[in-house]
Structure formats: C-alpha cells, structure tokens
Amino acid sequence: MGSGFYAQLRSLLLANGCVLVRQGKGIHEIWRNAISGKNFPLAVTVQSRHTANGILKDAGVA
C-alpha cells in the first residue's frame, strides 16, 4: 500500500460514504463522494498533513 497518511485517509473516506472509482495515473486513485457525486484524486503517498486535510476538504468530509 502507501505510506504516510494514506491508510488513515482511506479509512476516513470509506467511513464517510466515499467509494473508490478507479485507479488513476501513477500513484493516484480516483474516489467519489456518494452523497455529493464529486470525484477527487487520492495519492497513495500522502506525506503531509496539510495535503491530507486538503484531500478531505475536496472530498467534502472535512
């Protein structure tokens, strides 16, 4: 799997109704918020908490 914050982000996203849509290019995955229908990318190598917070914001979770 990834390193850094990936496992925590994945758990939070799944707990909040987000689903993995497909594998993106390289180290990215494309996820969808089931409530809003919005797609967003998630890198499997998230090292910064600021990046992790930005992903949660894009996902509509934070």
Model regions and ranges:
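Basic nucleic-acid-binding interfaces
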Residues: 1-25, 32-62
